């Protein structure tokens, strides 16, 4: 959730100030600008959330997270509110950032295409309030991943079929 009274730059800086309190103003500014540039928002740093599309707002959230250089990043349905094209574009951006920054990520998602594209392992949960781990599926695609190459590989569809059959 973005702070509506703050620009994209300010929203990212909010966390950076707290995580890097001893960094100089110039160093913190460089961290923020680099994070926003990495998600394609170099020209939108001074925009407020009300001036941004849902996809742009999601990019600011991603920039805010990666600017903090976490060892573990938890993403809970990060692309759920987005249209299909924006979702795919942001998945590509996210995958590029995670590969480059080497951030371990735990992704919660109900989108089987998304988990096959982004994840190395899928932990499938059983139904119900007392849910447990039902099965773990390893996704054996090389990194860096390319969506068009994966879509031509029979392994991609075997993984999808396996996930869907577990869910049904």
Predicted segments — roles?
Residues 9, 45-48:
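Signature (C-motif/LSGGQ) region and adjacent switch/coupling loops
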Residues 73-76:
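Catalytic Walker B motif of ABC-type/P-loop ATPase nucleotide-binding domains
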Residues 13, 17-20, 24-44, 96:
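Conserved ABC ATPase "signature" region
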Residues 62:
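Hydrophobic anchor residue at the start of the ABC signature
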Residues 47-50, 68:
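Conserved signature/switch motifs of ABC ATPase nucleotide-binding domains
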Residues 102-108:
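Conserved H-loop
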């Amino acid at each position: 959730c973005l702070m509506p009274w703050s620009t994209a730059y300010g929203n990212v800086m909010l966390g950076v100030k707290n995580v890097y309190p001893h960094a100089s103003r110039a160093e913190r500014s460089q961290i923020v600008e680099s994070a926003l540039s990495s998600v394609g928002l170099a020209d939108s740093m001074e925009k407020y959330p009300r001036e941004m599309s849902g996809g742009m707002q999601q990019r600011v959230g991603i920039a805010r997270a990666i600017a903090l250089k976490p060892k573990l990043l938890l993403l809970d349905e990060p692309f759920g509110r987005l249209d299909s094209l924006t979702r795919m574009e942001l998945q590509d951006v996210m995958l590029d950032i995670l590969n480059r920054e080497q951030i371990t990520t735990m992704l919660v998602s109900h989108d089987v295409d998304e988990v096959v594209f982004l994840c190395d392992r899928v932990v499938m949960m059983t139904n119900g309030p007392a849910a447990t781990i039902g099965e773990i599926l390893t996704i054996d695609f090389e990194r860096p991943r390319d969506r068009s190459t994966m879509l031509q590989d029979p392994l991609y569809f075997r993984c999808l079929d396996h996930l869907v059959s577990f869910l049904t």
